[in-house]
Amino acid sequence: MAEVVDERVYTVPLRDAKKAPLKKRAPRAVKALRQFIERHMKAEEVRIGNDVNEKIWERGIKKPPSKIRVRAVKYADGTVEVRLAE
């Protein structure tokens, strides 16, 4: 694994996904999370962990959470890994 450059904990708002049609809400929430992390961590590549994806999809495609708390770890090669904050 590459050297860790930065590690932050964010509460990411996913409320804008609720404006999407019912059958597109969870995918829209994943995109919103990816865009938020790219913007705030200045990342070239964002890898979303399985645990985060499962948390977003937990209640199905129609009802993603309004916000999610995640831990973002940036490595020296510019990639960011996103996991659930505990």
From Swiss-Prot:
Entry keyword annotation includes Amino-acid biosynthesis: no
Q: Which InterPro entries match?
A: Ribosomal_eL31 (IPR000054), Ribosomal_eL31_CS (IPR020052), Ribosomal_eL31_dom_sf (IPR023621)
| Keyword vocabulary terms for this entry | Ribonucleoprotein, Ribosomal protein
Q: Which GO terms describe its cellular component?
A: cytosolic large ribosomal subunit
- A Pfam family: Ribosomal_L31e
**HAMAP family reported for this sequence:** Ribosomal_eL31 (MF_00410)
NCBIfam families the UniProt entry points to: PRK01192.1-1 (NF002258)
UniProt protein name: Large ribosomal subunit protein eL31
Q: Which organism is it from?
A: Methanopyrus kandleri (strain AV19 / DSM 6324 / JCM 9639 / NBRC 100938)
Gene it is expressed from = rpl31e
